[in-house]
């Protein structure tokens, strides 16, 4: 269910949608992730005698942290959108994210989508939890990325911002309406 739309250039639309899952037709889902790749679902990599907690701890200790602002592309799952994990959090820092890392991750995600010929993607509000960006800053950063993608040329035609609650949807609708009004007033 979408309620508001902001158009960039001649064909990239930013829309608000209610729900955490990508809407029908979305080929990619962009989700938040931390540098150690421990947020979200943990899948079984191999069978061991360790408990799940021990296995995760061992895998985390053995892996190299990812750079903030990067994107990790998940494995293909039949019938589901491809998952792009936007690495925006580092819980060893305070605050754990910043606008620069969110911008870099979103820009990388849209560029990766372009190289894959993706036309539609869903984006969870990455970087807005854990004392990160405000909804207004996130929407501003995403708008900048969409504008850049539209100006430089992209296969992406629709970006859905996936909002978890009706309250959050209402807040983003207000912010998007204000942004649309400001665009009309700009010279």
Language-model features, listed with the residues they occupy:
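Glycine-/small-residue-enriched capping loops at alpha/beta junctions
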Residues: 1-115
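Phosphate/ribose-phosphate-bearing ligand recognition and processing surfaces
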Residues: 90-187
